[in-house]
Amino acid sequence: MSVAARMREFESALDQRAPPENFLVARIDGRNFTRLTRERHRFKAPFDERFRDLMVIAARHLMDCGFRVRLAYLQSDEISLLLDKNDATFGRSMRKILSLLAAEARASFSVALGAVGAFDCRLSVLPTVDRVVDYFLWRQGDAFRNALNAYCYGMLRDQGGSAEEATAHLRGMASSAKHDLLFA
């Protein structure tokens, strides 16, 4: 066996392929985006249209970078992509899918921002449509909780509370109470 063949064995030791006829959902998540968005680029909290537009640019790029994407869902610094269950791009190599989606997101986002933004990617292999629905309900629920908490936190800070006071006030508070706090 040649040195190249031996090295390829080591290199591919962790290669796995997603099983056919399963849905793949990739979650591409911004790395250290709190620092990037608040400290380095001073995006407005809890929501900044400029940041949203950058994430839309990245998501659109991901939908057109060689994978058969059926749905893209954005929340905050995260993009979830539902890949066609029959997509055989790169032989469904999970390592390739993970690395390329993270790299493509980084490239498109960074070019649009004019500075480097990094992403990681994880992959869910889902056997049924019901599990796909569960996945997107989970992400939607997370988006709702995060947005509600961020708006309440921002309101408490705007009213003069310190970061510690706002955090303590919201700790353990039910979503319904947070809603009432915002709309009282």
What are the functions of these language-model segments?
Residues 1-184:
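Regulatory and interdomain segments flanking nucleotide-handling catalytic cores
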